[in-house]
Amino acid sequence: MLAGVHDLFTEQDRLAINTTMAAGSQTQFDALLVEQPRPSVGKRLIPLIGLVLLAIVIGLILVAMIGGLGLIGLVILVVASVFLARMIARWWHIRSLRNASRLKVIGGYAESRGWQTVDQIALPATTPLLRSGDRRKTGWGVQGTLGEQVHFCAGEYIFETRETSSDGNGNTTESWQQHPFTVAVIGATLEGIGSMRIQKGKTDGIWSKLTGMVTSLQPVPLESQEFNSSFQLLVSDDADQIAVRERFTPVIQVAFVDRGLGTSQFEAENGVLVAARKGSPQTDNFGALMDVLADAVWMRTVFTNKPAGRLPDIAALRALLLGPNA
């Protein structure tokens, strides 16, 4: 996100929350390492079996090729694979403990806010992004309410596309391509607008016009040429144009230009608003997940504020997002 007076969650906020969580997760990690000093049996056996089998296969090939010297190579490979398996098991164990410690600290923060952490966030297929691909899945995240009535969830969302390829003999191979996102989903009814999409681009550009031809969304050029050149704003074909312009007043257009979208994109449909960025959320960068949630909160306010067209109250929204002591 670009720094500006309309930022709800700043770079300083992200660094502060990440620093606090890093300190807490290190304490948790030290405690977990005392409780679980050695990798589990599974973590030790999986790399050991895999590497030893690979070493044996390579060693047998060497024996077949160079005889007795290959046998010596086989022994060396097996011994090396045992040591390598131990290193991998240790790395796997440490990585798992660090991830667990980070999630524990995130869980503590979420609990202090009245939220909860989940292994899989619940996402209904309410917007085009959440319906994309041939199959979809979710990962870890947080969910709860902001204030009394604003329900949200934020975390990992992945849609997968099936890809097939054929060789010269007509044999077909199928593979799956993953498209991971960090998303924040929040309730929002866009009165008079219905559904919308806004992302980096040009509202009056060729891609916006093509999108309007093949989807139920149409581009809406506004008064600010700088806005139109920076953002692609699409709304329902049957949207009330007056309602759109009541929301996107000149002062709101200036706020968009000042604030920027960073790498976020937004969709709203069926009473839900989605803020999304490419890439999965990381447990060692919880601030980035909070940043996406902040984007969703700010955008929701633009579309639901009453009276329409006023600038979001940043101080009030920061208290909503970060708590009364923000």
Across the structure, where does each feature detected by a protein language model lie?
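Select subsegments of transmembrane alpha-helices in polytopic membrane proteins
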Residues: 42-52
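Hydrophobic, membrane-inserted alpha-helices
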Residues: 53-60
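Transmembrane-cytosolic junction motif
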Residues: 81-109
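Charged, low-complexity intrinsically disordered regions
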Residues: 15-23, 33-44, 105-165, 171-326
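Residue-level detector of alpha-helix boundaries and kinks
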Residues: 73, 91, 95, 281-284, ...
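Short, charged cytosolic
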Residues: 1-31
